[in-house]
Design a protein with these regions (language model features):
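Bacterial N-terminal signal peptides that target proteins for export
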Residues: 1-7
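Bacterial Sec-dependent signal peptides at the C-terminal "C-region" and cleavage site
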Residues: 16-28
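Mature N-terminal segment immediately following signal peptide/propeptide cleavage
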Residues: 32-55
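Single conserved hydrophobic/aromatic residue that forms the stacking wall/gate
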Residues: 286-297
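Active-site-surrounding "flap" and adjacent substrate/cofactor-binding loops of secreted or lumenal enzymes
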Residues: 57-88, 94-97, 114-120, 124
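Small-residue-rich helix-loop
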Residues: 232-263
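Bacterial N-terminal signal peptides
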Residues: 8-18
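Amphipathic alpha-helical interface segments
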Residues: 100, 119-229, 237-241, 263-264, ...
Length: 297
């Protein structure tokens, strides 16, 4: 494990030592053993890294459509290393997270937004869309949270914070409201509105996954941190409803989703293209996944 991940693992242990959280269905107390905690933290980071690698061959290639079942997706024991060696930018989902994790390691759990923004602004790794504009804004003197505000960042509703909010949930086991608070400090550096809601929702699901293995419960419970009047909440609620209506046919749900929610103006590069980078439409794919095959959709 890399030095960064070791630091992060230790942080998680200190943060939730002797965890006892009443968050599950029956409001019963939930206690995590150190071994269970360690396994879940490692699994969270491994899952994120493997997910980036698995999506590498198809990213931005099947726009506005599904990947047909007969399309093979190559995978072997060398896949992760090959992608990292040839296109490390594929892992922006991971290295942006680690930038914020290092701020917590240096400044503590009460680190202010300026500390995160400064660290993010000093990075030199590849960035795109909301992240790229946010870093440019910071370097031009536009401070957070204005760096992510939609009037200053035309990509504010893009998927950026959604793919890098994992850390907030990983370090808030069983505490989705705490995950949302971390997102409030960090997420507005590059995102606003739906772009921010996507990150909060992902973080909340990570948080709840520490104390429940019930996917339906996690998906529904995490949605409570999102305002009901928002389009984001309405879209996710639709997907939950369609999945209940077509439990064995995720493709039918996908078509319903496209029919109602695929018109987006959230990304300047994608306004006239089937670009698939709007936050709502991407996160909804989590919901229509079959529990054992989420990466295939």
């Amino acid at each position: 494990m890399s030095k960064r991940n070791i630091i992060w693992l230790l942080m998680a242990f200190f943060f939730i030592a002797d965890l006892a959280a009443a968050v599950h269905k029956g409001k019963k107390e939930v206690v995590l053993s150190e071994q269970s905690l360690r396994d879940k933290v490692k699994g969270a980071w491994a899952g994120q890294t493997l997910g980036c690698s698995y999506g590498g061959p198809t990213e931005f290639k099947f726009l506005g459509t599904i990947i047909q079942d007969y399309i093979p997706i190559p995978w072997d024991k060398h896949t992760v290393k090959n992608w990292y060696d040839t296109f490390p930018g594929l892992y922006d989902d991971v290295y942006v997270d680690l930038t914020f994790v290092e701020v917590f390691e240096r400044c503590g759990l009460d680190a202010p937004v300026d500390s995160f923004a400064t660290a993010f602004g000093r990075t030199e790794y590849p960035l795109w869309h909301a992240n790229q504009v946010a870093r440019y804004n910071l370097l031009q003197g536009v401070k957070a949270p204005q760096s992510g505000y939609w009037k200053n960042n035309p990509h504010a509703h893009c998927i950026d914070f959604q793919i890098e909010a994992d850390f907030a949930g990983i370090m808030s086991p069983g505490m989705p409201n705490q995950a949302a608070e971390i997102c409030d400090r960090v997420g507005h550096i590059m995102s606003y509105g739906e772009g921010w809601y996507g990150g909060v929702y992902v973080a909340a699901m990570y948080s709840l996954a520490y104390v429940s293995n019930d996917i339906e419960y996690i998906v529904k419970e995490a949605l409570k941190v999102i305002p009901e009047e928002s389009d984001f909440h309405k879209c996710m609620s639709d997907v939950i409803r369609w999945h209940r209506k077509y439990p064995k046919d995720w493709k039918r749900t996908w078509f319903e989703l496209q029919n109602k929610w695929s018109e987006e103006i959230s990304c300047p590069e994608g306004i006239h293209n089937s670009f698939n980078i709007g936050t709502k439409i991407n996160l909804s794919l989590i919901h229509i996944s079959e529990p054992t095959r989420p990466l295939y959709i």
